[in-house]
Structures are given as structure tokens and as C-alpha cells.
């Protein structure tokens, strides 16, 4: 634990050895993430992390100290806005908090994007963190834009616990996608169809439940060919389309009433 803290501090201080190690890990991780998202047909215009904003933080810290917007308490820097619990900006050893780097991302976005609204799509359990962050945005006068936290629930197993693999490890997205494909391959051998349906299963399982609530990911249930599942919906769509084609009616001009 202490070793990890020291490494984190050295990264914040831009120590060359740690930066080089980090770059290697960063490049491998980013390529892997992009590859997985590409398989799922998800794309982003920008892939930015804490490292892209870290250099903006020292000047910000000096500014809030100078303006008496933050005070030192046993070496730690705390926002002087009266929040309870207090908003910790840096630890006593000078290392940054999640709040610190989140503020850095806001500084970066205000400089480069200047959006009217910033939406954070993050686990509902981070609600208090974002409430505190948004109060600091106003207190430090970082932006006049609107800030929203769109929280979502956790994906659980049949027992209501966070979804894990059989070995008790965190269920990685790629592993989940692979397991869905294996399940669907038992009823359809066409690789292209299986991949398409697997994406539908993942998407539908998220959309069919209340966004802020936790839900149970039941592999057999969500890959079922009947009932409330993505596969059944797509099957129904194909059947309906086939009936329309056989009717010889130009359905583009049909109207829906009632």
C-alpha cells in the first residue's frame, strides 16, 4: 500500500522513471480498450485521462492558496468553502485526490471544449463525490456551464452480489461478451449473426432496467429466444417485416391511428 502511494506521488511529481513506466502501461491499456470498444461498435472522438490534465493542476493549486480559497490543515489542502465533510484537494504528502484530477479535467475542457453542459455518466455510488465536485466548480468559479451526474446501478449476479466470474474475479466486459457468444453459438452457428445478437443482448440488458437501479445479469434469461429479451424483439421485427413483404402493400405510406 505504501509503495503504491509513493509511486502515485512520484507520478504527480513527474518523475522520469515512473512516467516512462506509466507510458508503457498506458499505451497497452488504451489500445486494448479501443480494440474492445471497436468490437462492440462503440467509438469516441477523444480518449483522455488524468495524464492529459495533470499539468494544469499545480497552477490551480497556487491560485486557490493565493486567493485564500483553500487552507492547509496538518499539511493537507482543504477547500475553504465550508463543506461537510471537507473537500480535500491534496493530501499532506502533496499527492492528488480524485477531486483534484476531476477539477483538472474541468480546467482542460473549459480551455478546449467550452461546452454548455457537462454530463458525467458514472456509477450511482459516486453521487456524493460529484455533489462535492460541482459545489467546488461554483466556489472556485471554474465554469458557468451546467454540470450533471447521470448515475447508473451496478450489474449483479443471481444472488444480488456484484457480478463476478466463476473464479471470483471481476467480470471484464470482453469476458462477458465472449460468454454471451458461447451461449448463443449453441442455437446459431453463424458467427456474424452471433456477434450481432451478442451486442443486442448487452445493450438490451442495460436498457430494459431502471437506469439508477441495480440489476441481475442472468445469461440464460437475456439470451432466451422467447419472452422479454433482445433476441425475441429482433425475431419479432424480422417476422413483422416478412409479413409486410408478403402482403405486397407499400407500407411506407401506412398510417398508425388509435
Positions of the model-derived regions?
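NTP-dependent nucleotidyl-transfer catalytic core
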Residues: 1-258
Amino acid at each position: 500500500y505504501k509503495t503504491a502511494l509513493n509511486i502515485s506521488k512520484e507520478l504527480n511529481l513527474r518523475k522520469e522513471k515512473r512516467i516512462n513506466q506509466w507510458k508503457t502501461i498506458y499505451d497497452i491499456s488504451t489500445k486494448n480498450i479501443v480494440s474492445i470498444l471497436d468490437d462492440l461498435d462503440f467509438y469516441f472522438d477523444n480518449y483522455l485521462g488524468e495524464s492529459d490534465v495533470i499539468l494544469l493542476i499545480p497552477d490551480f493549486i497556487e491560485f486557490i492558496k493565493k486567493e485564500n480559497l483553500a487552507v492547509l490543515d496538518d499539511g493537507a489542502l482543504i477547500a475553504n468553502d465550508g463543506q461537510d465533510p471537507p473537500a480535500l484537494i491534496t493530501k499532506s504528502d502533496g499527492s492528488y485526490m480524485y477531486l483534484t484530477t476531476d477539477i483538472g479535467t474541468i480546467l482542460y475542457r473549459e480551455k478546449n471544449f467550452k461546452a454548455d453542459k457537462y454530463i458525467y455518466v458514472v456509477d450511482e455510488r459516486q453521487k456524493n463525490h460529484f455533489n462535492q465536485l460541482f459545489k467546488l466548480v461554483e466556489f472556485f468559479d471554474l465554469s458557468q456551464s451546467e454540470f450533471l451526474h447521470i448515475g447508473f446501478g451496478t450489474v449483479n449476479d443471481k444472488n444480488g452480489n456484484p457480478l463476478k466470474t466463476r473464479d471470483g474475479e471481476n467480470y471484464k466486459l470482453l469476458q462477458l461478451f465472449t460468454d454471451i457468444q458461447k451461449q448463443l453459438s449453441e442455437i446459431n452457428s453463424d458467427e456474424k449473426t452471433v456477434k450481432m445478437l451478442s451486442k443486442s443482448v448487452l445493450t438490451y440488458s442495460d436498457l430494459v432496467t431502471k437506469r439508477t437501479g441495480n440489476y441481475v445479469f442472468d445469461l440464460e434469461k437475456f439470451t432466451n429466444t422467447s419472452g422479454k429479451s433482445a433476441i425475441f424483439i429482433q425475431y419479432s421485427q424480422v417476422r413483422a417485416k416478412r409479413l409486410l413483404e408478403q402482403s405486397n402493400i407499400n407500407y411506407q405510406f401506412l398510417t398508425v391511428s388509435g
